[in-house]
Regions:
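A short coil-to-beta-strand element that immediately follows conserved catalytic motifs
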Residues: 62-70
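Charged phosphate-binding loop/patch that engages nucleotide di/tri-phosphates or the phosphate backbone
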Residues: 129-155
């Protein structure tokens, strides 16, 4: 079974705002909407190093003091593949904010983000980012995403 590793990072500034990326749809990946920066783990790269690299590429910021928040696990029964997205958060960063080919980036309050056009399933990703008793979400392609609590119970 093929497994793909990815990452996503929630960055919070001193005013409590989060760095949001308005991801643009692409023919190879139609996933779009408000989300956090992140991407794929390259061969031979650690997950943490991939977060630092992806955030820098997509936002211009260099992050540090990353805290692991949990992960999202997707299963595709047609392709017999799985996809893991490791979630991190931090409030430690430096650099100048810049947009990238992935989308525009801007600081927003969580309420502003939630009122916007979220990327698919982003509300469930946020639950894992923000709740220590929900370390995982699990989904089957085309069937949605379920939260998983510390006892392995789907919610």
């Amino acid at each position: 079974m093929e497994t793909e590793l990815c990452n996503m990072c929630m960055i919070t500034d001193a005013e409590g705002r989060v760095l949001v990326q308005e991801r643009l749809p692409k023919p190879s990946n139609p996933w779009s909407g408000l989300t956090f920066p992140g991407g794929h783990v390259e061969p031979g790269e650690t997950v943490v190093a991939s977060v630092i690299r992806e955030v820098q590429e997509e936002t211009g910021l260099t992050v540090s003091n990353l805290q692991n928040c949990g992960y999202i696990q997707w299963y595709n029964p047609v392709k017999q593949s799985q996809y893991f997205v490791f979630l991190f958060k931090t409030n430690t960063f430096s650099g100048e904010l810049k947009d990238s080919v992935e989308g525009k980036v801007k600081w927003m309050t969580l309420d502003e983000m939630l009122a916007g056009s979220l990327a698919p399933n982003m509300i469930k990703y946020l639950a894992v980012f923000q709740n220590e008793t929900i370390p995982q979400a699990y989904g089957i392609s085309g069937q949605g995403l379920n939260l998983v609590d510390n006892n392995g119970i789907l919610q």
